[in-house]
């Protein structure tokens, strides 16, 4: 969970860590997704500026880690490198919708548990 957000998203997109050609674009898209996550109730407002920001700086729950990471990857993939196939595009969108629902439910449960305490 201590891995770099930018580096891990680059790896999932098939971009080597050493290649910095797309870093500015990826950082912009990643930060846009963090705004969406915050609006869904996941995490505090958060942005990255380079490869030094790590996942555990954004999310402290190991339980939600992979869901958040998958969500950020899929959203960035659609923004940065959308698939040519409409069938693949619809599959990505369906996965994103499901992850949004699950993240929102988890955030609401966490919020109601905190309020009840």
Name each region found by the language model.
Residues 53-81:
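Mid-chain, well-packed structural core segment of small domains
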Residues 28, 32-35, 74, 78, ...:
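Short, residue-level hotspots on alpha-helical faces of the histone-fold
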Residues 78, 82-117:
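Protruding loop/beta-arch "assembly-hinge" segments enriched in small, turn-prone residues
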